[in-house]
Amino acid sequence: MAQCLADKRPIIYMRFASHEPLVKPQPGVTIYELNPHKGFEAFTIEVRELITKEGREACYVFDCLSELQAAWSADLMMGNFFRVTCPYLFELDTVAYFPIIRGGHSFQTIAKIRDTTQVLIDVYSSPENDLYVHPLKMWNRYSETMFLAHRYSPQTKEVFTLTDGMEASKFYALAGEEAQAAPDRNTDSWDRFFAAAQSDFRQGTLTANTCTKMCNMMITKDPKMREMVKRYFEPTDYFEVRNHMVGTGIIGGKACGMLLARKMIQLQQPGVYKHLEPHDSFYLGSDVFYSYLVANDLWTIRIKQRSEEGFIDEAPALKEGLLNGSFPDDIRERFMRILDYYGQAPIIVRSSSFLEDGFGNAFAGKYDSVFCANMGSLEERLDAFESAVRRVYASTMNPSALEYRRRNGLDRKEEQMALLVMRVSGSHYGHRLFMPTAAGVGYSHSTYRWSDSLDPSAGMLRLVAGLGTKAVDRTQSDYPRIIGLDKPLAQTNQTWADKHRYSQHNADVLDLEKRTITECNVLDLADLFPRFAQQAVFEHDREAEGRLRERGQFRPVLFASCQGLAENREFTTLMANMLSTLERCYEHPVDIEYTVNVGKDNEFVVNLLQCRPLHLLQSGKRIDLPKLLQEDTYFSIKQCAMGKSRVTPIDVVVVVDPFHYYQCPHIEKPTAARLIGMVNEHFRNTGKNCLLLVPGRIGTSSPELGVPVAFADVSNLMGICEVASSEAGYSPELSYGSHLFQDLVEADIYYGALLEDRSHVYYNPHFVERFIDITAEVLPSTVTPSAGMASVATPSAAMASTATPSATQQSAKASSQFGKSASYEKTTTLVQVFDTSSSSLTLWHDLRTNTSICGLQKNLRE
């Protein structure tokens, strides 16, 4: 320091520890007070920003790095901090001093520090107040006595090389005594803490403070979740998690929710708990994610992506890096132990980030989960497992996840990805298929009331045959079974034809031969299912079978409706009790994911896979619905909408023309999704309320069934209406329980379905023709096919009510052409945008009666 001051080089003191200050305030010294308890990422980025600010050739003094171990609970993250900070200091031609307590850290951590630093020196103090200095690494320096121990005399301020045998023996005796007194340095401080906690538990001296520390450092950072974990967890629960953990850090929201829910059921409903499958999950701690970033030199781009300007723009590059990184040998060894444990049982690698499944933010479907068939040699299984981990890590850069974080004010919050590794619940069918009998999602409180007689507080199940992906994704022509738990047999479809049509036609299964998820016709599973599983999942179409018998044909006509499970009162009662218990324990509505496997005599087991607080629609005050003239009504619907009660003026109406969308070639149908995304971005932060009308299902993965938007494409809209068109085969689905619906709820986006042949539905598609068409102002004149989109030409002038017939009118005239071979015109009005801000167009929705009206009322806004 004296030399730096003499050279007039700035001295920067990074102050973050509880020990006495190493540098006193004085001219030429800048002191920064830092808080490592904000977390590794926030702390590390703050330090880097300060280093950038101070510039080149500065001198730095850091507090003792060992204090970071206490703040972050593990040596690993302290080592990671040094590995990303030291090279940056070197890059700026600085001099930096980092003290660390010898003997308090694992050999592995010190080895990483030694590999990174340019100079490493051991310092010892003797009882005689002599100081011994032992250089361990001197980069680009060498002398014959450099790496011998040296003695420094505080009295004479002289340094002597220990070449004398007597002097050297004193030093080695001192070093040996310290080594014997140090803790086991073959283990991390994390492991030493848990070993001590288990020892205290066996001796009956474990304290509540130690349990709290285990919760805080390993289970969750969510304050509400922490309180519940401490209320329900026993010490052995913490130890069990640690024994199944790879690395250090937090296990994340999804893992925490699953464990907590199972513990609540175990303690509060032992009868229900007997029907739960035991779990033997593993957890990849959140620190492994950061270590992966550091080990693959991705930290710099991570910092760029964390910035406001790079949050979206830098994501693709970081995602690419995450997909192509490699894991340290010690982590790969732990991965192999997991695979050895599971043998050849299929497993799934699930995201379990800091922010997932907590109060206020569900992150439903934002991050990936990857199934592993777990077949082949150990090397093949390890490659597949590592690939799955990389994919989930990379999904943190998914556009929908980033948009969700930005919309909910989470873009500046620390987000680490932990992982939950679970055995896939199910049975083998034939030689290659694996799946549960059924799976789905459940809600302790349902706002989807297709009948006034249903009790929302009784809860609801969304149930499919096979893997549960069909229950949470909007796919092709599949309709999950909806079960209101107060009236399990109540259905929206009354005729056999409707029951058959609006049922599940395809199932997701794990193909062990192809080692991937595959979709198959659900009827192909009927012959593979044992009789008791058939009875649980499949239902006979008695009407169709009767017609066949009249023709002399005797064969069953089946469709998948999970009717047998709906009729199983023990199952529906158990699920109702489970959901109500979890809601009571959470003191908040919840939703769950689960599987069901059935056996003989109506026996069954349920695997509780996930539980999280449910973002519930609030009814608010009762809305007085206006009585509008028919010519002033755009649409009115009952029992076909979702969203909180509201009276909202509408500034913009966006319409996807059903005829042109139908005629659009399959490969170019994503045009509509792209254009909707452009409209969504155009009106971001403008304060304008935009209402979107689309044919069929919004957000489906099958473009022929609807527009395949992601949530990021509609995140700024006020409302969305799905429009039925039987001629084109477009049919809305009120997908309560899908990930997209959860996004709409959290974003407070209204959803309505304009169904056909319903007495309580009125819809006038020509209504928007009276408004000004502003498509040309909002959308580009063309969207080129080279980007995977069809060309789209917009009108050259605003359209009034007396202008050329709109796309809506053209659709009406051309309705007879649906299903016929009609050429698709590349230049067409696929999406139209109408300015309604100067009118009194308003949406009224009353959640209590589930009634919506959209239309004009004079002077509404005055």
Task: Describe the predicted segments one by one.
Residues 54-74:
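Conserved P-loop NTPase "ATPase switch" module shared by AAA+ and STAND
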Residues 101-155:
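Phosphate-binding/switch region of NTP-binding enzymes
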Residues 239-303, 309-311, 316-329:
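A conserved helix-loop-beta module that forms one wall/lid of the active-site cleft
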Residues 71-72, 77-104:
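Substrate-engagement module of ASCE P-loop NTPases
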Residues 140-178:
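C-terminal regions of RecA-like/P-loop NTPase motor modules
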Residues 103, 220-221, 225-228, 232-271, ...:
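Conserved mixed alpha/beta core segments that line enzyme active sites in large multi-domain catalysts
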Residues 1-49:
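Conserved P-loop
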